[in-house]
Amino acid sequence: MGCVKLVFFMLLKLDLLEFKNMFTVNPNASDYCYDYTDQRMQSYPRTLFWNKSTDCCSWDGIHCDETTGQVVELDLRCSQLQGKFHSNSSLFQLSNLKRLDLSFNDFTGSLISPKFGEFSDLTHLDLSDSNFTGVIPSEISHLSKLHVLRIHDLNELSLGPHNFELLLKNLTQLRELNLDSVNISSTIPSNFSSHLTNLWLPYTELRGVLPERVFHLSDLEFLHLSYNPQLTVRFPTTKWNSSASLMKLYVHSVNIADRIPESFSHLTSLHALYMGRCNLSGHIPKPLWNLTNIESLFLGDNHLEGPIPQLTRFEKLKRLSLGNNNLHGGLEFLSFNRSWTQLEILYFSSNYLTGPIPSNVSGLQNLGWLFLSSNHLNGSIPSWIFSLPSLVVLDLSNNTFSGKIQEFKSKTLSTVTLKQNQLEGPIPNSLLNQESLQFLLLSHNNISGYISSSICNLKTLMVLDLGSNNLEGTIPQCVGERNEYLLDLDLSNNRLSGTINTTFSIGNSFKAISLHGNKLTGKVPRSLINCKYLKLLDLGNNQLNDTFPNWLGYLSQLKILSLRSNKLHGPIKSSGSTNLFMRLQILDLSSNGFSGNLPERILGNLQTMKKIDENTRFPEYISDQYEIYYVYLTTITTKGQDYDSVRILDSNMIINLSKNRFEGHIPSIIGDLVGLRTLNLSRNALEGHIPASFQNLSVLESLDLSSNRISGEIPQQLASLTFLEVLNLSHNHLVGCIPKGKQFDSFGNTSYQGNDGLRGFPLSKLCGVDDQVTTPAELDQEEEEEDSPMISWQGVLVGYGCGLVIGLSVIYIMWSTQYPAWFSRMDLKLEHIITTRMKKHKKRY
């Protein structure tokens, strides 16, 4: 027997070592590590110290039965394991396991093996956040002794409706079920374990009506069903069996069928209620005021109205969110709640609150997050806010607060956004001495004074928005040198002067730089070439005196470039590289002194403009993940007017070269930029014809070629541009008949004035019989009769979301990016045939 037992332990050790050797140890594999109570854990490589010279039952993460010596527990959570988890893993030789935890590792691309269902004695199984993928096998439902099952992951795990029902039916001993973010796409059956204490099913595509039996589970402590918009929840009108035990109820973004019933008053143990985005309406439900043990109450993103009650019974409150509702009245209740000594978060943004913030508020020494943005609050910001010792985030933006920004007592500030108010005075020194400040947004106020070089001491700063104030002086030289985490810099629309003398250091993180609307002089700083992540550069409306900085084209991420309204001059020369400005979506060089021909090589490099993204489900914004605190600002001219665009859609593509001294012909290569929405070449000295290739600009909405020397006829093919909303061809030398078509028939006289040779609607000079323009359909028929070679028009309707934009807006906010696209182009021979038939002895365009 001794030999048999020895062999058994040797085999057991070999199985464990073989399992260890399947994976590498990588600290990044357990980056985000939490225990089941959502407390952050420290990861460490448990298997690193396993070796064959020691007893495997003493190894970290392993627990053996004292009698049999069998491994009964294997806890490898947060063990930094990385690699493929194979279905023939030696792990499955440990047939006596009762607890198995492999959570918070990285098994990317691995399927959950059906062999997990062979651990018949298993009571705890946790495979969470380890990047498993595919379908959860039905064999998991064979683990009839399970008390805890956690398989939550963001890596496209799914569980078919049948398997979900089977799992709930067979696992009758379950205490905790966590399938967070697993695609279930099913209703919830009513036959599930009566022992459940924790039921976590958020983001699981649940639908139908939640069985009322869930609320009568006598041991239920935590119910999490959030983010299932197709799930309908009806709360019992009578007392729940779980009333005494239920501590956390998360039903955010589900469909609440009826009003909150009086039965809520009996939830005496409830600590946290998340009921945002549930279409709640009317006044804040009165049954909630009896929840005297509540610590977290989130009712935001609903349609609640009326004043905010005093809430004096919530003495244990830590987190309160009523934002994005229709609440009105003042904030007087803050003066009456002196017992809120534990309050940490107060979120009342986006309501209709009015009046000043009460000045006699006390007892909020633990308040760390205060959100009152987008209301109608006024008056000065009271001193108690600046005196909060634990303040981390302050958002009072988009109100009408006035007065000075006082010095902050807190040393732990992460975000301060006071933009869009009427604040004045200098930037307080206490803001410039923060060790953890990441977002500082003070734009659109009346802040004055100089920008101190102390701002460079903010080592963690990611967004600095001081635009649209009265700041003067020079830009601190250190801004581009010492703030290595700074992503977005907006100093636009101030009174800053001098040269841009900052040196942008190698390895910086800038994504957006806007210095628009100042009095800056000198040249475009060459060190900008070090901003390799830059997406937006706006130096417009200054007094820069330089030639075109062609080297900016090497910034491979650049999407928006505005150099408008400066003193830039000379021809735009480009190198032989075809990789310059490839991702550019907005190019604004207007109101300068550029001369020579239009930059044909640069226009030919604009690869992003050469395609229409018809498959994007939702529009993306240039400001990506930081949009919550900051949006880019740039001013562009489109449809004849200047606009400050607060958000630039990823699908918006604009070229503005107006008000320069460009001459020569319009390059036909512009017709390859099929994604172009706005083209403005007005007020130059351009000549020649309008290229027929413009017919390919199928999503073009605004075309301005006015005040040039363009001659010839308007190409009849332009009548196919069904999205064209604004057209200005005035003050040129155009002749012939104006094309007829749905869009062209909507343009008035001003689109064509100053062209004495033009005829046809809407002008008073009509086209005679001899001048009648042949439509594209007629041309096709005639060419077929003559058997002439041609490429026929083929309109491919791909569908569209919002159609034409309402009003004059540069951002054209559309919630679908699918548009009609016309892919066929006439070749030169066809062009010759068409123009000859339209007007004998005329030149080709």
Swiss-Prot record:
Indicate how the chain sits in the lipid bilayer: Single-pass type I membrane protein
Spans annotated as C-cap/acidic domain? 742-794
**Glycosylation sites per record:** 28, 51, 88, 131, 170, 183, 191, 241, 279, 290, 337, 360, 378, 398, 446, 501, 545, 656, 680, 696, 728, 749
Topology: which residues are Cytoplasmic? 816-845
What InterPro entries is this protein classified in? Leu-rich_rpt (IPR001611), Leu-rich_rpt_typical-subtyp (IPR003591), LRR_dom_sf (IPR032675), LRR_N_plant-typ (IPR013210), RLP23-like (IPR046956)
**What keywords are annotated for this sequence in UniProt?**
Cell membrane, Glycoprotein, Leucine-rich repeat, Membrane, Repeat, Signal, Transmembrane, Transmembrane helix
Q: Which domain of life is it from?
A: Eukaryota
**Residue segments, region N-cap:** 20-70
**Renumbered ranges of LRR repeats:** 71-94, 95-118, 119-143, 144-171, 172-193, 194-217, 219-242, 244-266, 267-291, 292-316, 318-338, 340-364, 365-388, 390-410, 411-434, 436-458, 459-482, 484-506, 507-531, 532-554, 555-579, 581-605, 649-672, 673-696, 698-721, 723-741
Give residue ranges on the Extracellular side: 20-794
Membrane-traversing stretches: 795-815
- Primary localization: membrane
In the UniProt record, the signal sequence range is 1-19
Subcellular location field: Cell membrane
In the induction comment, the record states: Repressed by sly-miR6023.
What the entry lists under Pfam families is as follows:
LRR_1, LRR_6, LRR_8, LRRNT_2
Q: What is known of its domains?
A: The extracellular leucine-rich repeats are required for the specificity of the elicitor protein recognition.
PANTHER family to which the protein is assigned, alphabetical: LEUCINE-RICH REPEAT RECEPTOR PROTEIN KINASE EMS1-LIKE-RELATED, LEUCINE-RICH REPEAT-CONTAINING N-TERMINAL PLANT-TYPE DOMAIN-CONTAINING PROTEIN
> Could you identify this protein by its name?
Receptor-like protein Cf-9 homolog
* Name of the coding gene: HCR9-0
